[in-house]
Amino acid sequence: MTFWERERVAKLIRFHGLPAWFWKKKRMDYDLIRAAEVVSLRLLYLLAKADARGRISEEPGELEEHGELFADYGKELGIWEKPFDFANSYTRYQYFHKEEMLPKAVLYDNTEFDVWMMAGIPLAGKDTWIEKNGGGRPVISLDGIREELGVSPKDGSGKVVNLAISRARMLLRKKEPFIWNATNLTQEIRQRLCGLFTGYGARVHIMYLEAPYEEILKRNQIRTRQIPEPVLEKMIDKLEMPEPWEGYEVSYKIDGDF
């Protein structure tokens, strides 16, 4: 199974209940448009239809009716088989990060410079990507700061992150492009950083890297400071796949596709 096939199945499982209950959502348009960023609404509809028809129920037709409403609304929004067609990437980013905004709005892009945020478990190839594509830009690396300070990865004091953010602010104030190099495994962490960077007028590009598990283990064996396998497993369990709406651009570099 390829990366894309795996993610398609994962998103169908995650959003499988949306056709039945979308109409109860507070921001109905928003939830459907956000879902359409990562999954085909047509496939969700077919999955929900099969689910409804396979149930033993006193009112088997109710879920199917909800599914038909879902299909009609998805088609009306123009997201039946593709993501919403925003006016530009700036408008798209703002739509997904503001409380209330019409998707058909046209906003002027006032970003001034670019910031790249790396994401992925250790040994996925982030450093290699930076070497090949960084273009000499400043790199703020949490691992690098740990080595600089002689701080153990187990140290939870926050001094490494605080210093990294302090250095990032210096570059942000100067509107200087840079690369933020860390695992950034959860959506919460990525969105907190996006909020910081965009607050200074940056366009944030998220670069997610992934390598086969066997390759990760092989690389770990030749690493100077090896990561215990249980720690790697915990990080994989913790990983939340970056979604296209999280940044101005989200790229997926799989199996060394740099």
Tell me the role of every PLM-derived stretch.
Residues 200-219:
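Conserved phosphate-donor/acceptor-positioning beta-strand/loop module used by diverse small-molecule
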Residues 75-110:
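N-terminal pre-Walker A segment at the start of P-loop NTPase domains
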Residues 116-119, 124, 136, 213-258:
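Conserved GTP-binding G-domain of TRAFAC-class P-loop NTPases and closely related GTPase folds
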Residues 178-182, 206:
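Short catalytic-loop micro-motif centered on adjacent basic/acidic residues
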Residues 181-190:
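Acidic, metal-coordinating catalytic cores used for nucleic-acid/nucleotide bond scission
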Residues 1-68:
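Divalent metal-dependent catalytic cores for phosphoryl transfer on phosphate-bearing substrates
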Residues 106, 110-116, 174-176:
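Pre-Walker A (Motif I) flank of P-loop NTPase domains
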Residues 127-178, 213-217:
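Conserved substrate/cofactor phosphate-moiety recognition/catalytic segment
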